[in-house]
């Protein structure tokens, strides 16, 4: 039933306004933050956060971080990993020094052979390389350096 005044207005003039004599609505009656999830707030945690507490399964002591991790990049995308200034400096010009493209720094693990490379010698550092990619890089006058 709607009333004219709210509960707080009704309780004006009563010493503790419904909050008891001793604590008087002070401090942290249920503990701070998520305290008491296993004790006095258990029903709330069980209903709204099932599985919040406890462990599941077994620990793997000698877990290897994904040994098959090797995101791939194709030959036609190799020059996009290089900054624009470097690209303009080397592409289409005969220079004594070949640019080094470290594929691993860009987040790739393997170079695949799709697409064409410009006829500019380049040194490519990678963990894995396909046979066709290596052939095409050598055909363009470049070198593949395998790094750990």
UniProtKB/Swiss-Prot annotation:
Its main location: cytoplasm. It holds the Pfam family Ribosomal_L27A. Belongs to the universal ribosomal protein uL15 family. InterPro entries: Ribosomal_uL15 (IPR030878), Ribosomal_uL15/eL18 (IPR021131), Ribosomal_uL15/eL18_sf (IPR036227), Ribosomal_uL15_CS (IPR001196). PANTHER family: 60S RIBOSOMAL PROTEIN L27A, LARGE RIBOSOMAL SUBUNIT PROTEIN UL15. The modification Phosphotyrosine is found at residue 108. Component of the ribosome, a large ribonucleoprotein complex responsible for the synthesis of proteins in the cell. The small ribosomal subunit (SSU) binds messenger RNAs (mRNAs) and translates the encoded message by selecting cognate aminoacyl-transfer RNA (tRNA) molecules. The large subunit (LSU) contains the ribosomal catalytic site termed the peptidyl transferase center (PTC), which catalyzes the formation of peptide bonds, thereby polymerizing the amino acids delivered by tRNAs into a polypeptide chain. Keywords: Cytoplasm, Nucleus, Phosphoprotein, Ribonucleoprotein, Ribosomal protein. It comes from the Eukaryota. There are 2 genes for uL15 in S.pombe. The gene is rpl2801. Component of the large ribosomal subunit (LSU). Mature yeast ribosomes consist of a small (40S) and a large (60S) subunit. The 40S small subunit contains 1 molecule of ribosomal RNA (18S rRNA) and at least 33 different proteins. The large 60S subunit contains 3 rRNA molecules (25S, 5.8S and 5S rRNA) and at least 46 different proteins. GO terms for molecular function: structural constituent of ribosome. One of its GO terms (cellular component) is cytosolic large ribosomal subunit. One of its GO terms (biological process) is cytoplasmic translation. Residues 1-38 are annotated as: Disordered. Transmembrane segments: none annotated. This is Large ribosomal subunit protein uL15B. It is found in: Cytoplasm; Nucleus; Nucleus, Nucleolus. The keyword Cytoplasm applies. Residues 1-13, 21-31 have a biased composition (Basic residues).
